[in-house]
Amino acid sequence: TKKSILGDFTSLHMVVPTLRCNSSCIYCQVARKNRDDHSADMTKQTAKNIVKTIFQSPSPCIKIEFQGGDPSTDFEMVKYIIEEAEWQNLFKKKALDFVICTNLTLLSEKMVQYLKKHNCMISTSLDGPKDLHDINRPLQDKKLDHHAIFESHLSMIRKIWGNNDCASALMTTSKYSLGRFKDIIDEYIRLGFKSIFLRSLNPYGFAKQYKEKIAYPIE
């Protein structure tokens, strides 16, 4: 029937707790806010309404993916949504999963232990070796070494989880990536990733603003 698709209605729900971020990625597709700017933080009432709406989906599976900004800049809201969803699921009895998309740099051991306890997988970005990653994804604090912090925190995360599969990564292709694909793959292998997801630029946000600097022909 025409309505049969509704039985498997969308299971993936992307939630943006905040637009705050500590990175200045050259291709950022959102209107990110500085780390101390709370003007775009989600309220608890909004979060509660979102979770309630998510569980109205007839799908037997629900995956909540936290995006941003970087959700780790408002980790208390991430925790609130996870626990609200788990409470709702006591009654709905769905297969419930969580993913947090983060640059890793603000994750503490306590945060990672919480994510493990609630089975919230980690999705991150790695654009290649240090020089390429730091060109594409500089931190707002220029004194900090993004790639070095990334590598250190990745090791910490895997140690707490006890495996390498808790964190996956994708790379976004800028003009600086072209001709560097062997270097990029070698870096993924060096850091113990078993897969790589290649993402092209989206023609909006900062990628559109700086297209003369970072864009490339579709061909």
Predicted regions and their residues:
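N-terminal-biased segments
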Residues: 63-70, 128-135, 139
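Glycine-enriched alpha-helix->loop->beta-strand junction motifs that scaffold or abut catalytic
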Residues: 116-122, 192-194
